A protein has these predicted regions:
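Small-residue-enriched hydrophobic alpha-helices in membranes
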Residues: 1-139
Length: 139
């Protein structure tokens, strides 16, 4: 019984470590990884999974390490694409929030989101709607 409980918790943490690693990758792609971006990532992971709020620093630390060791985004997206479209849309929304956190939309950031959308089966139309939603929210 306890083994199963710990196994599920480990799976949950791994899921959020992968998501956080993708978000860290997006934050670093413009060569500037700010405290504001870290705060957005932490808040996003806490909002996605309320039970991990006490472990958020550990999750972010593991995600940063995973992102440094990885050489492709496929590793981060392969699990995320299995979840509902609403969940995947939320991930894209968080990515746009990270992109706009410094007030600019770098070409590398846009390209990354376009590639992630393809890997997560999010259409260009839905991506555009999500992008506009984030822009309106930040005004």
């Amino acid at each position: 019984m306890f083994k199963n409980l710990f196994s599920k918790k480990k799976e949950t943490n791994e899921k959020y470590i992968l998501i956080a690693a993708l978000l860290v990758h997006a934050a670093k792609i413009d060569k500037m990884y700010s405290d504001v971006e870290k705060k957005i990532i932490k808040k996003a992971i806490i909002n996605l999974d309320q039970s991990n709020s006490s472990e958020i620093d550990k999750i972010l630390e593991k995600a940063e390490k995973k992102e440094e060791e990885s050489n492709q985004i496929l590793e981060f997206t392969k699990e995320i694409k299995k979840y509902s479209s609403d969940f995947r849309f939320k991930i894209i929304e968080i990515l746009w929030e990270i992109v706009y956190s410094d007030g600019t939309n770098d070409i590398y950031e846009s390209n990354l989101i376009r590639r992630v959308c393809g890997l997560l089966y999010v259409s260009d139309k839905d991506n555009g709607i999500i992008k506009l939603k984030v822009q309106k929210k930040l005004k």
